[in-house]
Amino acid sequence: MCSFRGRGGRAAGPAAPGFPDVHHRNRAGERDIPGLAPTVAGRSRRPGADPTRCFNDPMSTIDFAPSERSRLGLEWEIACVDRRSGELSPAAPDLLARLGPATEFPHVTGELLTNTVEIVSAPHHKAAHAVADLTRMVERIHRLAEPMGVQLMSSGTHPFSQWFQQQVTPGNDRYATLIDRTRWWGRQMMIWGVHVHVAVDDRDKVLPIVDGLLTYLPHFQALSASSPFWSGETTGYASNRALMFQQLPTAGLPPHFRDWAEYESMVADLMHTGVIDVLSELRWDIRPSPRWGTIEVRTFDGISTANEIGAIAALTQCLVEHFSRELDAGRTIPVLQPWFVRENKWRTARYGMDAIIIQNPSGDERLVTDDLRALVRALEPVAADLGCTAELLDVLAIIDHGASYQRQLRVAQATDGSLKAVVSSLVRELLDGRPDRSRPSPDDPSVTQARSGRAD
């Protein structure tokens, strides 16, 4: 089994601009397994699953697939909405039937709810090429959806649809088991996100890079925050999705692992006790994806524009490549204490771009947008090597013009609280591929059906 090089100690010389000073991270591995409300022998397991398979042997290993360094792939969850009402529409099964089998990349798949489709790009070296996959598939889905009276949008949550009116995708044992186990919280998962995979060329690097990326989780979350509303209410949070999703027992922040063997041991424990049946049921905000040889960042709220997806993809790719170079050079990766990581997640879920985050183990603080500007400058040489400079610089445009949650709140304010107007703006953004910075009038006929902060 592997142990990791480059962990511990202070880096020689001052920290680079935009990167916190490096200290040794000292925390015990978190091995808390939630108590399960018993259904069958204390566990809820997929029908027909073998509780002894694969990971009952403590010597079992999890192979990390070979992959081309820093290639990336994108997954974009998209909601189907009714053209007239703006409500969520259970149109995904019909759309998927019209699209045909997902046999190659890029492709479209179903998700937990029948109102959702997910677009998966092919792996690419350049962020722009992965984003182009997504936009081509969006155009194809839109052409099929339009005659059905269905429109497409992406945000962390829907502004006013009700969770209890949504349908779970039938015929999927994994989804049925999730809902059976998690009940009320599982049914509340009316949320959407973007996932960014970046390939890592050496398994020994994976867990240190995951730890390093957790330092930048608040940056990811602030840039993508797009869920200020829930069931017709203004929540006061930039990313309500971030706090909703972590209610699932295997979601939220990942534990710290000393090495790959400890990660394998934890997976064996969870398999043996029925907490998970397959590795993908570990739904952490940032996680290893051994099947693809990648690290998967799942922190991002649903993003309504291809332009912004390119920005967060480039930022993620550049950080992973930067950390990989640091490890190659024998240097350590900056990490934070787990209590600071948790606090940063809450702060940016609550305050978004106005959050003051904890930068380093010493507890120094800084406005997240100021730290993002410095981070972009520090990563520009890496971006030049990866061919994603333009996409990385789009991070600055999000800072200057506002993240999705800010735009949604502005639309609601400009239209006397119309959440249907918010949905309309999200639909326009997805089709245009760029943020909608217009301010609709309260007299716009597309928004007169809904006022007072709720949809009529």
Question: What are these language model-derived features?
Answer:
Residues 1-52:
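Compositionally biased, low-complexity flexible segments
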Residues 203-205, 211, 221-242:
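Glycine-rich, mobile lid/loop segments that gate access to catalytic sites or pores
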Residues 134, 172-181, 200-221, 304-317:
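Helical (often loop-to-helix) elements that flank the catalytic cores of nucleotide-handling enzymes
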Residues 196:
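An acidic/histidine-cluster motif and surrounding catalytic segment
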Residues 124-191:
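Well-ordered mid-protein domain cores that form the structural environment of catalytic cofactors
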Residues 158-162, 227-237, 332-340:
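Short proline/glycine- and acidic-rich turn/helix-capping motifs at secondary-structure junctions
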Residues 164-176, 236-249:
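Short, low-order "capping/linker" segments at domain edges
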Residues 57-148, 178, 245-456:
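C-terminal accessory/tail domains of diverse enzymes
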